[in-house]
From Swiss-Prot:
HAMAP family hit by this protein: AddA
Gene Ontology CC annotations of this record: cytosol; DNA helicase complex
Chain sites annotated for binding ATP: A47, S48, A49, G50, S51, G52, K53, T54
UniProt keyword Nucleotide-binding present: yes
Protein name: ATP-dependent helicase/nuclease subunit A
Reaction(s) this enzyme catalyzes, per UniProt: Couples ATP hydrolysis with the unwinding of duplex DNA by translocating in the 3'-5' direction; ATP + H2O = ADP + phosphate + H(+)
Superkingdom of origin: Bacteria
Organism: Streptococcus thermophilus (strain ATCC BAA-250 / LMG 18311)
Domain UvrD-like helicase C-terminal: 515-799
Name of one Pfam family that matches: UvrD-helicase
CDD domains: DEXQc_UvrD
GO terms (BP aspect): double-strand break repair via homologous recombination
Description of how the protein assembles with itself and partners: Heterodimer of AddA and AddB/RexB.
Amino acid sequence: MLTKAFLSPAEIEERIAQEAASDKDRKLTPEQIEAIYSNGTNILVSASAGSGKTFVMVERILDMIGRGVGIDQLFISTFTVKAAGELKERLEKRLTKHLGQAETDEERAFLSDQIAKIGTADIGTMDAFTQKLVNQYGYLLGVSPTFRIMTDLAEQTLMKNEVYADLFNDYMQGKDAQLFQKLVRNFTGHSKTSKAFRDLVYDIYSFSQATADPEKWLCQNLLKGQIEAKPEQAKNELLDGLKDGLLADFLAFLRDHLGIAQREFAKAKYLNNVSDAIILLEGSLINDQTDMEDLLKQLLTLSGGTGLTNMTRPKDEELKAYKEAYNKTKNEFVAQLREVDTQLTVLEVLTKHNDDILPMLELLQSFVLDFSDQYLQAKIQENTFEFSDIAHFAIRILEENPEVAVSYRDRYHEVMVDEYQDNSHTQERMLELLSNGHNRFMVGDIKQSIYRFRQADPQIFNDKFQLFLENPDAGKLILLKENFRSQSEVLDATNGVFSHLMDQEIGDILYDKTHMLVAGSQKQKEPHPENETEVLIYNSDESSTSEDEEGPDQAISSGEISLVIKEIIKLHEQGVRFEDITLLAPNRNTYLDLMVSFEEHGIPLVPDEYKSSYLESLEVMIMLDTLRAINNPLNDYALVALLRSPMFNFNEDDLTRIAVQADKGQFYDKLLAAHTKSGLHPEVVMQGLEAKLTLFTETLADWRDYSKCHSIYDLIWKIYNDRFYYDYVGGLPRAEQRQANLYALALRANAYEKTGFKGLSRFIGMIDKIIASGNDLEEVTDLVPKNAVSLMTIHKSKGLEFKYVFVLQMNRKFIGHSKDGLSGKYIINREKGLGIKYLADLKDQINTNLPKLNVVLETLTFQENRREERRASISEEMRLLYVAMTRAEKKLYLVGKGSKETLTQQYGTDVENNRLPVALRDQIATYQDWIMALDTAFMRKDLKFTVRFVEDEELTPEAIGQVEVKAAVDADDLSNNRQTEEIERALTVLESVEKLNHLYAPAIDLPSVRTPSQLKTFYEPIMDTEGVDIMDKKEGVQPLETASTFELPDFGQKTKVTGAAVGSATHELMQRLTLSDTVTLQDLTQALSRVSASDQVKARVQLEKLLGFFDTELGKLILANRDKLRREAPFAMLAEDPASKEDFVVRGIIDGYLLLEDRIVLFDYKTDHFTHPSELKTRYQGQMSLYAKALSQAYQMEKVDKYLILLGGKDLEVVEV
């Protein structure tokens, strides 16, 4: 066997010296060499952004393999499946290279063996490993190796709801029913449902599942905070802290003021109250027996109204400023006194109710424990589990079976983990159990820990960091701070921000010289002043921003988008490719607005959502559920998915009417009962639903019969054709991609059957196994531009790098600061457990005739949990900004919005330890405010970024510009080109078939799909292409020509507002309009603002006419039946071409219709100019008949009322056709 000794510390130092003396262009740093070769102890590598941690891991693994450690003797945990695949690929490539350089047969044989074992080595996510372990050893817990992973959220929710409902009923009827009702009411209030209580139970359950031992956590930690809470003690501590804190500061402030005020404002009446307050405060600080509560109330009485307020009107400007400063500071002190008084009141009430809260929460604890157990039993019965179950099974197997744990410890030479900062406590316990105590290699960066929402705990990394830093015998700490990604302009700006912002208090780590980014190469240090980091702020009036627009999910403003577009066009003109530019957004709420604006300016933009899983694409999921339902209609999930799909369009009301036909049983049985009207409530099955049921049952029966004697490939195409589903997705956004996905599904089914496997059931089973394993079928190539600007979330960008980066919405409020942030009725903390708001009845404490006087009180644990959660949330936001800023290679832009006047004046110059004060950092609610506070407090030369406010005048269309598009090639210029003999022969052949083409023109020119607009020649007189003017029909009219001329668009021309553009905008407005009992002009204006059209086009939309429509009988009918309204509804149907007698598909979009019980009311908006309504009635008679026929066939309903809503005349007209 191949064996080589590992390097000693002295040999590692020698390697470091040799590397330093080498003439390599890019040398390994001493820390990288240490990380690659150190051994014999636990190692924590703190790797800053761009420091080459993946390179270090690969080199370390290769070094161990080169010393005789087999790849199967390593446990390597990655954060994602993709990262595992990339690591395996790198290792295989490098080992193959080493194999070619091997000098001995023994070495070649060993390396060949390692390459062969890469596929089965333990390199992957922790989820993948635990599944593998439970598959092998699950029998020790009674878990079958054929278990299935529940990846469908709907399936999980349904099973949880069933368990919860049964348990809830048991508790409502149990011995503690009265206390349980009080518990439920505490969280549901006056709600008629227990949903709020159910959400609490689910949240506690989910939180516990992220711990290493959920049952232990529920028993020991869930109520820990409440058990340890001592309101009386907290009250005394609060009062004790008043003397040396708030009251002493208030006294010093009043004394200073009185000395000046008696001279400058000698006759002011408020000074008597100031003197009395000073006397009270001085007495309290001298006398230890002072009743602090009584003192507090006296001070608040003195300061009530204008008691301590300086109401004088000095003429001197300095005195005026002094007066205002005094009043402001005084008000702040009084506000703090009132806050203390409120806290004392709450603590007093909590003291009286503390004995009532704990029994109630103990009952909640019992409920959650019972729910957790019964939910697990339900999953065991179905042999289907969640990822967290498998992880806990794996922990139990290793803890309860020492021989299994020892076998793994003996197997692994090293236990390695990447992205260690994002580990959960469950994962950490697994690593402890697999390790022998001194063979762990952990790589990560706490500054990039951004996954708390996945229960990752950065404190795990931090504890290890501090332990190894303070006690080297416990393990070796290696810091990789050299950055090999970014230019010095990006690194300097990042260091400038976080050296003044991040520390242990906020951010969880002290950002000092130890953690500062350092350029790893000389080339990175070369100055490029033009690439200095820019903070670009769209200068807007804050009063124009409502509270509803603020918060974590606020929309991006048009000014910010214009600002970004202008900078991108400038970069493009300088020769920067679009693919080198990336936009980083806090979430996907901004995507639509950005895509619309970028398209208007001719800039290609690709959001990350394009790179979605093939099996998770909506159209493929619908087809898979269709196949599942055909294979087994008793599969409730698949059946309901098929019913709800666009193929059958059952809505929630329809499904409810079906569900009430039986108390229990499968949904398919209820559906059949509804169809035959033999269920419990046949009266609720109306005519429209009855027609839907008939169509569905007949179609499903037909498909099931067809599947028995035809291939899956043929079945899939029959489904596409029977319900026009393939055509339907062709009318949706990204139609080409969707149709390619559906086409690929049919091809893959065909390929599957060619391997010898037959049957729908087997095919579905194969797909389900792929999904359960977390894998996917090979993606169909995305039909997106290659040279395009990228758009992704900051979370998605982690681990990636881009030349030019725009960080968007710097003004977005953090979750902890938004009005919805931490305002719920409970907060869960890992250490202190559950903190709640308690609904206390104060009737006995307050003299009142009311039957109850309920007041919501924040328990001590709730307050403590909120403080910790808020601080943890702000720290993660700071780390998220660090991730965003360190993605850039060349230049970084930080983009936001705000008032220049406010942002430049609201922060002071106070600093603490060369950082912004902790209180200020904690109070600030946005990235932008952090940046502006730094800009005010520190010198620009220390920050290395510039702040520029951009005005509306700089964002006019002329100032922004447009992407230049190369002129189209003029076909006439090619007329004299030389022609080869092959081209001449081809032209001859083409000319010879011209006669045949003319003879069979109707059939040849017949497209497989037509729209109603293309069929106007079937049912109306001759008309122009715009469909505006009706002309006299002439003899000898030639057939419709289908010339193949393709004119390239001229992007340089000035946009001309056409009638078609106004019509499209009007249609989109009516589609986007939110309907209520009444429609106002404001509603229409808001809907118009969301229309994706130019301002010139929007200006031509006649809102007054549209508003008048809702005063007509048809408009009132629509408002009264909003739940039955369908808008912009796609349809497809077969029709016969009169010339060729060939069938073709008619496909189009219906503006809208009402699906009533006895009839369908169809309507269509027309913006054509007219002098008399009868003109348009005649013109669109055939088109409306076509729509009516399609609806009649789809819903099996004969009566269809047809209306045209005419907007192109002097007055609005509603005409029945």
